[in-house]
Amino acid sequence: MNCKVIACYFGERKEYPSNQKEAVSVLRDVVENEKTLSPGVSQLDTILVNHDCGMKYGNGYLNYIDGEETYAGTIRVLNRPWDNGVGASFGSFNWAFEELRDEYDYWFFQEDDYKIIYDHYYARGIKMLVNDSDLGFVGYDRGSKTDRMYNLDNIFNYFN
């Protein structure tokens, strides 16, 4: 069994999406992507972890989509306590793992304002893990013309 955990937060942020209305708009796009993009595996549940800060509009949206089908699985919504914001998205990733660790073999963790755009991304990650026993995880990140606009080439070159 496979899952993707997306950490959701509807409170105020420093950058876009900066409020719950914008966050829901971005998340709608992410969810639509989950319904149309092939992960390359026959089963992949999408787990949305709500770091619940009491935003009714955002919480209502998550309640509405809970149980919807995706390209290869089902949307599951987990609500974790606010706890004064401790842990942020990593706290949400950990929350999901602790709650569901026995249900899934492979895990993918993603922020709510990211969108994977390449077909078969999940299958490719599993293949890397299976074929190289020295790997403990596979990290996915961007690398595009947009990134070059922000002069990130030096960062990318550092790791080459």
Put a short name on every predicted segment.
Residues M1-D29:
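N-proximal low-complexity "stem/linker" segments adjacent to membrane-targeting elements
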Residues A7-G11, L48-D52, Q110, G139-D141:
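Short beta-strand/turn micro-motifs composed of small residues
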Residues Y16-L27, N84-F93, Y118:
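Phosphate/oxyanion-binding active-site loops and adjacent basic polyanion-contact surfaces
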Residues A23-Q43:
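Short, acidic, metal-binding catalytic loop of nucleotide-sugar glycosyltransferases
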Residues D45-T46, W107:
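Hydrophobic/aromatic residues located in beta-strands of well-ordered beta-sheets
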Residues D52-Y104:
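Active-site-proximal specificity loops/subdomain of glycosyltransferases
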Residues Y104-I117:
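Short beta-strand-to-loop acidic/aromatic patch adjacent to the donor-nucleotide binding site
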Residues K115-N160:
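Conserved catalytic core of nucleotide-sugar-dependent glycosyltransferases
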